[in-house]
Amino acid sequence: MAVYYTSRSRYQNKRFCVDYWTITRTCFYRFFETEPDMKALFPKIVQMNESNQLEWQMDRDMLQKHAVTVMEGLGAAVESLEDSDFLNSVMVSIGQTHVRRNVKPQYVKKLWPSLHYGLGVCLGDHYNKEVSEAWRKVYIYISAQMTRGMKNPNLKTNDELS
């Protein structure tokens, strides 16, 4: 199930013949193609050769696990748009997790073009201008909250305060 946001109905769930794995695999393959330096941040996914150089060969199972996590996070974000405290808490926490893995705030923005590409390829005509713009806005919001968590790794989230 792919989730997308529209201005008409806040958000909608639509069933497509595409699953999270297909969208995210397309996104990450594109990401590693257009941002090859980012492969070093994914040591469990991207394989190294005997010369200690990054290879295109990837651990499919680890990529799939990460892909599902990413898309479930995006889906949860869209479904939580009306509960900004919860959404902010989750995204800040995800940012804190990423900074512990040496992901820098400026890297988060680098993923959008590849996600945009992956959604376009996989959703086809359903990924029209309105849907694309809605996803872009959601991604900007998510990125801002993740960056907040990255810049404040010790910030308590709502979940931790409960």
Where are the model-predicted features located?
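Globin-like tetrapyrrole-binding proteins
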Residues: M1-S162
